[in-house]
């Protein structure tokens, strides 16, 4: 790691602070200083994040890790713009995201390789179901939640997905537009912010990404169509020859993705309840819980039927 000293101008960015520093040889460079949010340790494993960053950086993903301190880290600066939600569905960009995601999923991170989805969901559930709010209106809304029902939904979905034999990969788990950057001049795409990264089910990572097509307004009518999904799948499964992907492989990944998409809604719904209690950010996290959980219930019947029909098919199909 290079020694740097002296801080010049700094500018707050969406993913941290851009800081100009002068090296010992007099050269001025830009770096990014990321500060962890208060109470984020309740939902993020920082030790796991730091371990992953080193290996992912070596594989060409994200910014280089330059140093760590008590409540944050220093990384190299990426000269690129953050994508918008509409950017992600543009065919050329969707294909590039798919190709990069395949490569991301091939990175080997040492350590515990068990998928973390259901461990995390049940951990979140345990915390989310025992909260108390000082704000009486928040407490009233919170008490309208049937955690018995939520737990039953988690158990049913976990059982269904267990039959899909989804590959376990090192997953980003939070591939929204804000964690994708593009250098338009070089046409280079970057994945950033691996704080939720872990070994997980492939379909969860892709389904979670598709949920983010809804954008910051959470308009789930923008969820990608089957045609858009197949375009993504072709470039994910066969980056060099996407048109040669078989219909069988496309349908298998379609079922896998759209079943685990439901798990994405449950994951972030329970996460939101913890944030409603712990986060100092002025955001309606309770409202976000209901938004995600209601979307889960809206999509559940069709997605369960899709998976059950697929699993019941003759094995030679």
Protein language model regions, located:
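Hydrophobic core segments within long, regular secondary-structure runs in both alpha-
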Residues: 151-155, 229-234, 290-297
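Juxta-kinase regulatory segment immediately upstream of eukaryotic protein kinase catalytic domains
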Residues: 1-21
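ATP-binding pocket architecture of kinase catalytic cores
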Residues: 22-149, 156, 160-167, 185-186
């Amino acid at each position: 790691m290079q020694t740097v000293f002296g801080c010049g101008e700094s500018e707050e960015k969406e993913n941290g602070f851009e800081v100009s520093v002068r090296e010992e040889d007099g050269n001025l460079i830009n770096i990014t200083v990321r500060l962890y949010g208060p109470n984020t340790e309740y939902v993020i494993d920082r030790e796991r994040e730091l371990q992953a960053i080193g290996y992912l950086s070596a594989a060409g993903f994200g910014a280089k890790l330059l140093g760590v301190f008590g409540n944050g880290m220093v990384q190299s600066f990426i000269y690129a713009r953050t994508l918008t939600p509409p950017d992600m569905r543009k065919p050329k960009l969707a294909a590039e995201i798919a190709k990069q995601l395949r490569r991301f999923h091939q990175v080997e991170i040492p350590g515990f390789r068990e998928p973390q989805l259901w461990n995390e969901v049940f951990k979140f559930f345990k915390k989310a179901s025992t909260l108390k709010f000082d704000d009486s209106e928040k407490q009233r809304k919170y008490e309208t939640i049937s955690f018995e029902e939520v737990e039953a939904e988690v158990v049913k979905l976990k059982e269904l997905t267990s039959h899909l034999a989804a590959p376990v990969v090192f997953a980003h788990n939070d591939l929204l537009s804000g964690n994708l950057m593009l250098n338009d001049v070089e046409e280079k795409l970057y994945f950033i912010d691996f704080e939720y990264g872990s070994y997980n089910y492939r379909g969860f990572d892709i389904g979670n990404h598709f949920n983010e097509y809804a954008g910051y307004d959470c308009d789930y009518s923008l969820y990608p169509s089957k045609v858009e999904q197949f375009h993504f799948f072709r470039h994910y499964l066969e980056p060099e020859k996407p048109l040669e992907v078989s219909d069988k492989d496309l349908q298998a990944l379609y079922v896998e993705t759209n079943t685990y998409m439901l798990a994405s809604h449950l994951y972030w719904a329970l996460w939101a309840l913890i944030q409603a209690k712990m986060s100092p950010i002025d955001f309606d996290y309770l409202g976000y819980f209901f938004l995600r959980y209601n979307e889960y219930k809206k999509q559940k019947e069709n997605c369960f039927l899709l998976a059950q029909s697929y699993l019941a098919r003759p094995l030679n199909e």
